[in-house]
From Swiss-Prot:
Name of the molecule in the record: 3-phosphoshikimate 1-carboxyvinyltransferase
Family: Belongs to the EPSP synthase family.
Biological role: Catalyzes the transfer of the enolpyruvyl moiety of phosphoenolpyruvate (PEP) to the 5-hydroxyl of shikimate-3-phosphate (S3P) to produce enolpyruvyl shikimate-3-phosphate and inorganic phosphate.
Entry-linked InterPro entries: Enolpyruvate_Tfrase_dom, Enolpyruvate_Tfrase_sf, EPSP_synthase, EPSP_synthase_CS, RNA3'P_cycl/enolpyr_Trfase_a/b
Enzyme Commission number(s) of this protein: 2.5.1.19
Length: 449
């Protein structure tokens, strides 16, 4: 069900082609971090291109509740700009009411880290989907740093109350899985701790927090272990300074029109300002291995983040094997990759997808169900997803989204090229990350009704 309690069903029908030039919304990961670090900095942070989806807006509300001044302005030159006047490291105030993050696990977990280093008490809550997701992996290192947790249900589930440490301790912490959220929570708490806080990863996760901490003036060093892992060390108690941030277009959001264009005959689309951070572009690498025509141009850097213009043309795809080591760089894109695999010729095997089971829904089971109901042969073997591509998808199925925005968008992308229409039971949760998805796809030529 949706936030309002009313489902918003939609049907995607086969279209002639997708043609046009668009900019997908600002990156959700960068948007969350820009708001949080702006709130922890001294002075004003100006953010252009912020994703104005429900998840990010809930983080903005949380920053206001914790004492920062957050305003949305219209600038004659830059358009919409968000201004954040921060309270400084450790400067958060105890909020008057629980912090409600809606459906956003990223916002909730990152703010837990920021609160853990402040001598305040805050209650964290969310919607039914977020309440079902485990938080214990975030809470364990924060408790080692001196934070205290009360009121949690099984597995550290929301709602819960977090009392930040009055004298936070620097720690050396080895993450149990490749998780940018765990790493970021520890680093944000480490801002308030004296000395060096260190996070060790056996598999490198997305590095947006490290890049943005540098942009705001923190002393942080990231060193490769010579294989796939990294060691990140942060010097605590810096004075962060407000900064200008331009949020690049979200590659996770770009994934849906990209795959839709690849599988829809005659398509030729251009996506501008897409983030091309190598720790976020596993999907692009995989699609190219499958034979996708994805061309980069007009590359540039902003706040340490690379971005480029992408031209995507319809392509004949082939099945491939996707190694488990690639998962951290495309963890949010496996659902739509499964759609591409269904239209490919041959078998695609996606390995090591255990983390998909603790997302907004059990995305591993959801991906299989989405394909099966539309006539695609698919199998789950342990944590692997195996898709038998036949070059076409019969379609005709009704996809249950389980309040998951990415299931809804993946199914609608599939319907752009399936033989029969694909129906989606509820699209309202798309607003959490991509409010303009349906009208933007219609502008490109999608037939949604």
């Amino acid at each position: 069900m949706t936030h309002s309690g009313q489902p918003a069903p939609l049907e995607a029908r086969k279209c002639q082609s997708l043609i046009g030039r668009v900019r997908v919304p600002g990156d959700k990961s960068i948007s969350h971090r820009a708001l949080i670090l702006g709130a922890l900095a001294v002075g004003e942070t100006r953010i252009a291109g912020l994703l104005e989806g429900e998840d990010v807006l809930n983080t903005a509300k949380a920053m206001q509740a914790l004492g920062a001044k957050v305003e949305r302005r219209i600038d004659d030159k830059s358009g919409i700009v968000w201004s954040v006047r921060g309270v400084g490291t450790s400067g958060f105030a105890t909020p008057e009411a629980p912090l409600d993050f809606g459906n956003s696990g990223t916002g909730c977990r990152l703010v837990m880290g920021a609160v853990a280093g402040c001598p305040i008490v805050a209650t964290f809550d969310g919607d039914g989907s977020l309440r079902s997701r485990p938080m214990r992996r975030i809470l364990d290192p924060l408790e080692l740093m001196g934070a205290r947790v009360t009121g949690e249900s099984d597995g550290g589930r929301l709602p819960l109350t977090l009392a930040g440490a009055r004298d936070p301790l620097p720690i050396v912490y080895r993450t149990p899985v490749a998780s940018a959220q765990i790493k970021s929570a520890v680093l944000l708490a480490g801002l308030s701790a004296p000395g060096i806080t260190t996070v060790i990863e056996s598999e490198a996760s997305r590095d947006h927090t490290e890049l943005m901490l540098k942009h705001f003036g923190a002393q942080i060093v990231s060193v490769s272990d010579g294989t796939h892992g990294r060691k990140i060390s942060l010097t605590g108690q810096p004075e962060l300074h407000g900064a200008a941030v331009t949020v690049p277009a979200d590659p996770s959001s770009a994934a849906f029109p990209i795959v839709a264009a690849l599988i829809t005959e005659g398509s030729d689309i251009v996506l501008t300002d897409v983030m091309t951070n190598p720790l976020r572009t596993g999907l692009f690498a995989t699609l190219r291995e499958m034979g996708a025509s994805i061309e980069e141009s007009e590359t540039r850097l902003d706040a340490g983040e690379p971005m480029a213009q992408l031209r995507v043309r319809a392509s004949k795809l082939r099945g491939v094997e996707v190694p488990a080591a690639r998962a951290p760089s495309m963890i949010d894109e496996y659902l739509v990759l499964a759609v591409a695999a269904a239209f490919a010729e041959g078998t695609t095997v996606m390995r090591g997808l255990h983390e998909l089971r603790v997302k907004e829904s059990d995305r591993l089971e959801a991906a299989a169900a989405m394909l099966r109901v539309n006539g695609v042969a698919v199998e789950i073997a342990g944590d692997d997803l195996i898709v038998e591509g036949r070059g076409r998808v019969p379609g005709g199925g009704l996809v249950t989204t389980h309040m998951d925005h990415r299931i809804a968008m993946s199914a609608l992308a599939m319907g752009c090229a399936s033989d029969a229409p694909v129906k989606v039971d509820d699209t309202a949760f798309i607003a959490t990350s991509f409010p303009d998805f349906v009208p933007m796809m219609r502008r490109l030529g999608a037939d949604f009704a």
